[in-house]
Amino acid sequence: MRDLPFGESVRSTKKTLCRIQDPTIRFWFRVYSPHRSRWTTFSVAERQALVHDHASTVFEDYCRARFPGAERYWEGRVELDLVAPDPDDPKGLLVAEVKWRQLSVVERDAMRRNLETRWERCSLRAQYRRVRFDVLDASILRPRP
């Protein structure tokens, strides 16, 4: 699969990243295969950390799939997990940080402020005046009452 930063064209950018789309095959090549000879010597905590890192990328993919047109965005020292047309505002943009764990209210607020700071350094800022910032965490997986 070819990843492009949000708003970039295949024809005009060299900022292309290629990655395996299927999560199971990606797990094999990014997590298990590189460590196969040492896998049995890893502690449970080391294996859990590797699996957690993989699960976080799968969760980011899941979150991007929830919003039509959503992509990652990166430039220089700025990386945004999710950038998409805002479903609630046709002229706006949704910019979100994605975390594969449940966050407290304080953590969510701190991450939102950090996201806004990163947005201030982003060149997309000049093209989009109306932006909604959000933090998506594992709580979105809970069924709603």
Predicted regions and their residues:
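Accessory DNA-binding and partner-docking regions appended to nucleic-acid-acting proteins
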Residues: 75-77, 109-114, 127
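Short conserved micro-motifs at the rims of enzyme active sites and ligand-binding pockets
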Residues: 30-32, 95, 107-108
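Accessory nucleic acid-recognition modules appended to NTPase machines
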Residues: 1-79
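Switch/connector loops and helix/strand junctions flanking conserved nucleotide-binding motifs
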Residues: 91, 104-106, 141-145
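Hydrophobic, Leu/Ile/Phe/Ala-enriched alpha-helical segments that form helix-helix packing faces
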Residues: 63-67, 115-126
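Mg2+/Mn2+-dependent nuclease catalytic core
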Residues: 101-121
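Domain-level recognition of nuclease-like catalytic cores that cleave nucleotide substrates
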Residues: 124-145
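Conserved catalytic cores of phosphodiester-cleaving nucleases, focusing on short active-site segments
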Residues: 67, 80-102, 115
